[in-house]
Each structure stands twice: as structure tokens, then as C-alpha cells.
């Protein structure tokens, strides 16, 4: 019998391996709502409040906390307990003067890192297109689209944003506040593969026509390794442009 419509439930045993979630306590857990992040790169807000931050003992308490609107993601109130909090999202609780950044730990699990209060967020450009009117649309890793107004998209001096670059998005205005280009010598955060969760500098980029580019990086211990470009998230030059 065919499945009609999107799935509404998720068994704990079928949840992504990088969720910090006890598997055999109960049968089901929260399925994140469709949104800015894929399921394997995000956590539903309920799990963030109950299982990661430990602000609640059960789902009922966590829902009540979320519904107060006191938890912000990227400067916006989120009252839906299924809303996904994903990579590089800035989660803040102004009433408690706490700010967290959603990252991966070195085991690849989704985690929260307590950070300084920030008014910007890092986003990776995953694609870009020219839209009606000749302007450039940047498609970012968290599902948002940013329009860059230009007089002529074919001019290199106006088309400064490239796929793989990172941009700083202001909070809560949600507009572009800065730009960090992809390239050799830049500091990157690894979002997948064996070296997930590590910071490393780009040493070399091998361009390939039919497959993802191969990037050679060097970590703080001087170890060199290779990974594919989709796993490389540019965060700065010598230091991250935000507190990480």
C-alpha cells in the first residue's frame, strides 16, 4: 500500500545517528518539520530543549517552554516544537543571557556550543542563479535566498559572490553584512567525513569537471588531509569571523 503524504512519525531507532538521543527509552521521537535544514543536519527544537540543554524533564515541559517564544533562532522567535535547529544556527535565550551555536562535535554528532552574543550568522553559498531583472540570487545552506542587486551580472566586479563562499547574515535583519571568499589559505570548518567538526586551513584545491572538487587542508597539528568541497565551510582567514 502506498504512503500518502509526508511521514508524521519517527522511530528513535530510525533517527539520524548524529542525534544525541537515547534509542531504547521509548519507541518514537519528534520528526522535525520540513524547513531550512535536512533531518541529518538538524535537531527539532523540542530535543534541543529537553535532551541537549536539559531545560525540561519531558516533552510536555519542553513544549511549554518553546511556546512562550523566549527561544530565538537567528534572532526570530520560534514557537513550533518541531522546528529544526541546524548547522550554524544561532540559538539565543535573551532572558537567560545565553547564546549557542549549532555545530558538529568531532564524532559528527549535532551539538550546541555556548558562545558570545552575536548579531551575525555564517551561511555557505551552495548555489546561485540570475533572476528576473538581472539580479543575482544566492541560495544558502540554511534554505534562505538572498537577492544581490547588480546592474550587470556578467561583470566580474559586480558578481563577487561564488559558490562555496560564505556570507555573514545580520541578526535579526537577515541581510548580508559580510563576505568570506573560498580559496587557498582560508580557514574552514569540516561538516562531514572523517574529519567532521575540525578546523583546518585550505592548502590546495583540485578542480574536477564531473565530480566534487577535492580540497587539501592542514589542521592545527600540521596533519594534512583531503575531503570534498561540499564538506568545507569557510569561516575566516586566520581565525573564525564569529566566536566558535
Curated annotation (Swiss-Prot):
Coiled-coil intervals: none
Ranges where the S4 RNA-binding domain occurs: 43-106
InterPro entries: Rib_uL2_dom2, Ribosomal_eS4, Ribosomal_eS4_central_region, Ribosomal_eS4_central_sf, Ribosomal_eS4_KOW, Ribosomal_eS4_N, Ribosomal_eS4_N_CS, S4_RNA-bd_sf
Keywords noted in UniProt: Ribonucleoprotein, Ribosomal protein, RNA-binding, rRNA-binding
Entry-linked Pfam families: Ribosomal_S4e, RS4NT
CDD domains the record matches: KOW_RPS4, S4
GO biological process: translation
Record-level GO cellular component terms: cytosolic small ribosomal subunit
A GO term, aspect molecular function: rRNA binding
NCBIfam families for the chain: PRK04313.1 (NF003312)
HAMAP family: Ribosomal_eS4 (MF_00485)
Family stated for the protein in its record: Belongs to the eukaryotic ribosomal protein eS4 family.
Protein's name according to its UniProt entry: Small ribosomal subunit protein eS4
Record organism: Methanococcus maripaludis (strain DSM 14266 / JCM 13030 / NBRC 101832 / S2 / LL)
Gene from which this protein is expressed: rps4e
Amino acid at each position: 500500500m502506498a504512503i500518502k503524504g509526508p511521514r508524521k512519525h519517527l522511530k528513535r531507532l530510525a533517527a539520524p545517528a548524529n542525534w544525541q538521543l537515547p534509542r531504547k527509552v521509548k519507541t518514537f521521537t519528534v520528526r522535525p518539520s520540513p524547513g531550512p535544514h535536512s533531518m541529518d543536519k538538524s535537531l527539532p527544537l523540542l530535543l534541543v530543549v529537553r535532551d541537549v540543554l536539559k531545560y525540561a524533564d519531558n516533552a510536555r515541559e519542553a513544549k511549554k517552554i518553546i511556546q512562550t517564544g523566549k527561544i530565538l533562532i537567528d534572532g526570530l522567535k520560534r514557537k513550533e516544537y518541531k522546528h529544526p535547529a541546524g548547522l550554524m544556527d544561532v540559538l539565543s535565550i535573551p532572558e537567560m543571557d545565553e547564546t549557542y551555536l549549532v555545530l558538529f562535535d568531532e564524532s559528527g554528532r549535532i551539538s550546541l556550543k555556548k558562545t558570545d552574543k552575536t548579531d551575525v550568522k555564517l551561511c555557505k553559498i551552495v548555489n546561485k542563479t540570475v533572476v528576473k531583472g538581472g539580479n543575482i540570487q544566492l541560495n544558502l545552506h540554511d534554505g534562505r535566498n538572498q537577492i544581490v542587486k547588480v546592474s550587470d551580472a556578467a561583470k566580474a566586479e559586480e558578481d563577487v559572490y561564488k559558490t562555496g563562499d560564505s556570507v555573514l547574515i545580520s541578526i535579526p535583519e537577515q541581510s548580508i553584512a559580510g563576505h568570506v571568499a573560498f580559496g587557498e589559505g582560508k580557514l574552514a570548518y569540516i561538516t562531514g567525513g572523517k574529519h567532521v567538526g575540525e578546523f583546518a586551513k585550505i592548502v590546495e584545491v583540485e578542480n574536477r569537471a564531473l565530480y566534487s572538487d577535492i580540497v587539501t587542508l592542514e589542521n592545527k597539528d600540521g596533519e594534512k588531509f583531503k575531503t570534498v568541497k561540499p564538506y568545507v565551510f569557510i569561516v575566516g582567514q586566520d581565525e573564525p569571523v564569529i566566536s566558535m
